[in-house]
Regions:
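Alpha-helical transmembrane bundles and membrane-interface segments of multipass inner-membrane proteins
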Residues: 1-140
Length: 140
């Protein structure tokens, strides 16, 4: 929904102050990955997305890896954000970005990017802090 409303109501490259001094809404078309790297490589991103989807399915079904509910939520956030961006890439050739930090110089991003980042950080933190199998393998 955030991408739809951005495209429908904010002209391209226009800044709208959302929370003055904190957040702006800025419609940007990003044909690359993070920080606009690898611009125009939509099929590379599709292959990477499919690879990680396959990896998750492999871990879950073939290795009988049991994910905790928290880990499933993290994986769902990562996968959902990736899927949302992938749909944009394949449908339009770019990802709609709209969130700009006004208080620091940082690339414009979108809600899906937030889900991917939060899911990754929380999953890694959870695995390091609470996954006994992670530490058991490292002690050998």
């Amino acid at each position: 929904l955030s991408k739809y409303f951005t495209v429908a109501y904010i002209p391209l490259y226009t800044d709208i102050s959302f929370i003055p001094g904190v957040l702006n809404l800025t419609y940007v078309q990003n044909s690359g990955a993070a920080f606009s790297s690898f611009e125009g490589q939509q099929w590379l991103f599709a292959l990477i997305f499919l690879f990680f989807t396959g990896l998750i399915v492999w871990e879950y079904f073939k290795k009988k890896m049991a994910f905790t509910p928290f880990e499933r939520w993290c994986i769902a956030a990562i996968y959902g954000g990736g899927l949302a961006n992938m749909v944009d890439r394949l449908r339009m050739g770019y990802v709609v970005d709209m969130i700009e930090t006004a208080f620091m110089d940082f690339p414009v991003f979108n809600v899906a990017d937030c889900f991917i980042t939060c899911g990754c950080v929380l999953l890694m933190g959870h695995l390091v802090l609470f996954n006994k199998a992670f530490w058991k393998d490292k002690k050998k």
